[in-house]
């Protein structure tokens, strides 16, 4: 029986991983669809599509899937018609939260997001109710072995970035939103394709959470991220190491 239980646990974890992978693929495919329809289906002349293809590589999406999505979005039918949406509000402990999505039904998505906030100790606010607490930045990441700290900083500044930080995890270049595509392309021409390149909301200040509040906030974020319509969730909280260890136990 123990072996059977262990097998069930392994299969449950594998099933959860497969479900997560499928959800990641679905979100990236939506971005590819919107990116393709926002410009030309050629990534060399469509910066947003190029970024979407980079996202697909990050989640190890097969190249065939990407090509089919581009072909479908650029065809006469055009695929599903998605619009970009953004929601802002507060979670437990006054944590500010920004939710970005791509949806084919604004009313459905707004209802789901509002219900998630209400059910999990938060409140959905108006547009721009919390975004002033964040900076909208381009973030480009590279592994350590592509350049030294000084080389990356010099290249980043020359490309028009605001800063480059190097840690044991790699190089991270940040730039103004309007310079994102130019900076990314300049760095790519010098160091090759980045590990990741995306627009991000970075909080000006963070709320430090205890274990109970951290569980509540993470539950809300998990529910939001589980929606097919939601592409990304950003929040201004910080979880101390000891609390993170307790949550992982």
From Swiss-Prot:
GO terms for molecular function: DNA binding. InterPro entries: Integrase-like_N, TACO1_YebC-like_2nd/3rd_dom, TACO1_YebC_N, Transcrip_reg_TACO1-like, Transcrip_reg_TACO1-like_dom3, YebC-like. Its main location: cytoplasm. One of its GO terms (cellular component) is cytosol. Keywords: Cytoplasm, DNA-binding, Transcription, Transcription regulation. GO terms for biological process: regulation of DNA-templated transcription. The keyword Hydrolase does not apply. It comes from Gluconobacter oxydans (strain 621H) (Gluconobacter suboxydans). It is found in: Cytoplasm. The keyword DNA-binding applies. It holds the Pfam family TACO1_YebC_N. Transmembrane segments: none annotated. This is Probable transcriptional regulatory protein GOX1679. Belongs to the TACO1 family. NCBIfam families: PRK00110.1, PRK12378.1, YebC/PmpR family DNA-binding transcriptional regulator.
